[in-house]
């Protein structure tokens, strides 16, 4: 057996290196150069450790912040409530004035406000029914856009934003063009909730819209409609607002009243402060009290596509009092001379007819209608229907002897569109009749603190 060479130089070399390493490590008599090198190495290691600790700290903070932000956003973003399961919530706290309650920390961002403002501006510019009577107001509306965009960007609360929108819409000086109030929204929603084929169903049932309008609270007491007998011989119907879903109840009250006083031959319809946009009520209510069937035909010109959903719904609904073929005739092909608006501003036109068939429930009675300076829109339309079909005597309780924008008789219902972020619905005048604008021709003007008493004196 061969013995290992204990004097193997290779082995000796390895042992020498290990020994040398131990000696160097344990040797405290280091050279200044070696000491400086070790200090530099130590500082470098400390810097590396500090960077690692900083990176881990930042990562830990992000791990905490990101999930917390997502949870916060989930809890505070507008919820996607289903339709129509939310309808009971929508009907809480009816209001006529759009006053917005606290959103508990979830307000609209500046970007959302600006996006809604841009939608409002662009939709109105493309679709508003411009004519010679409103061209100056329309141009002022467009010129003020930058000014109001800056105001809206700097607005602090949602309520400030909505007030600014209302101010901006008022520049156009058109009573049809405004933010839809909660009172009207609630009534329209109740009517259209089961009409799923209607475009109004989609607008009113938009989750963002429902979420917004359920948070609108009462700003003032809402005056309810009422029926009564004045001086034992005059039927009085007070309509401060229009609610199509309450017509059946109102007609029952009228039946009770006229049954208790069978000699009634005169009625007062009080439309004071009524500026409703609800044409559904007008057409349904009028049929009970007109003396004969009402028919009115018009050619309706329109500039954009917003009105098309309304025309489609009218054409598809066999029971609608409005009738139209909706064939989108090109305005440039219209050969008749138009003097009161610029035909080049309009894209299409369609014939539209309004036909209201008299209901024979009630006998014909003398009709007196009371309005004031706040009466507008569909209330004025109702007064015009009674005046044209039943020779109604229309009285305005106001000082101004001249016609105002509120006295205009609109020939076609307004179109509605949604501001996606805020969930507000905007009503817009989108139709222009071929004929000159009509304004209510009042039989008499009064200035009375007690207008019903004044009406009774007029009746005699």
Predicted feature locations:
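N-terminal acidic, proline/glycine-rich, low-complexity intrinsically disordered segments
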Residues: 1-12
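Flexible, low-complexity junctional segments that flank or bridge functional domains
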Residues: 18-24, 29-60, 66-316, 366-368, ...
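Solvent-exposed alpha-helical segments and adjacent loops
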Residues: 380, 384-385, 456-459
């Amino acid at each position: 057996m061969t013995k290992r060479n204990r004097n193997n130089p290779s082995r000796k070399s390895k042992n020498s290196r290990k020994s040398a390493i131990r000696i160097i490590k344990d040797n405290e008599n280091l050279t200044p150069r070696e000491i400086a090198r070790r200090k530099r190495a130590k500082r470098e290691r400390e810097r590396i450790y500090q960077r690692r600790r900083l990176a881990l700290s930042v990562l830990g903070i992000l791990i905490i912040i990101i999930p917390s932000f997502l949870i916060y956003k989930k809890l505070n973003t507008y919820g996607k409530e289903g339709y129509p399961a939310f309808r009971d919530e929508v009907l809480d706290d009816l209001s006529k004035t759009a006053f917005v309650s606290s959103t508990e920390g979830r307000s609209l961002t500046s970007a959302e406000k600006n996006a809604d403002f841009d939608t409002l501006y662009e939709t109105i510019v493309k679709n508003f029914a411009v004519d010679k009577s409103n061209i100056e107001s329309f141009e002022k509306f467009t010129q003020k856009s930058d000014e109001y965009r800056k105001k809206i960007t700097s607005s602090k609360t949602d309520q400030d934003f909505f007030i600014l929108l209302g101010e901006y819409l008022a520049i156009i000086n058109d009573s049809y063009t405004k933010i839809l109030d909660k009172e009207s929204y609630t009534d329209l929603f109740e009517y259209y909730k089961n009409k799923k084929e209607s475009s109004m169903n989609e607008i009113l049932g938009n989750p963002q819209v429902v979420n917004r309008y359920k948070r609108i609270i009462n700003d003032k007491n809402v005056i309810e409609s009422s029926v009564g007998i004045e001086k034992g011989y005059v039927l009085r119907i007070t309509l401060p607002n229009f609610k199509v879903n309450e017509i059946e109840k109102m007609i029952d009250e009228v039946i009770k009243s006229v049954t208790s006083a069978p000699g009634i031959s005169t009625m007062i319809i009080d439309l004071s402060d009524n500026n409703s946009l609800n044409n559904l009520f007008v057409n349904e209510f009028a049929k009970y009290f007109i003396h004969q069937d009402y028919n009115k035909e018009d050619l309706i010109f329109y500039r954009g596509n917003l009105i098309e959903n309304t025309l489609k719904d009218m054409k598809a609904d066999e029971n609608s009092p409005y009738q139209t073929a909706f064939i989108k005739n090109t305005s440039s092909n219209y050969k008749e001379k138009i003097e009161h608006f610029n035909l080049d501003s309009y894209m299409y036109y369609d014939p539209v007819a309004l036909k209201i068939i008299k209901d024979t429930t009630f006998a014909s009675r003398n009709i007196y209608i009371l309005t004031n300076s706040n009466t507008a829109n569909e209330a004025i339309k109702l007064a015009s229907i009674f005046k044209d079909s039943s020779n109604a005597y229309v009285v305005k309780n106001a000082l101004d002897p001249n016609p105002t924008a509120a006295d205009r008789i609109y020939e076609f219902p307004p179109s509605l569109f949604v501001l996606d972020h805020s969930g507000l619905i905007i009503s817009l005048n989108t139709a222009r009749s071929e004929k000159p604008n009509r304004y209510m021709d009042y039989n008499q003007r009064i200035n009375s603190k007690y207008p019903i008493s004044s009406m009774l004196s007029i009746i005699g």
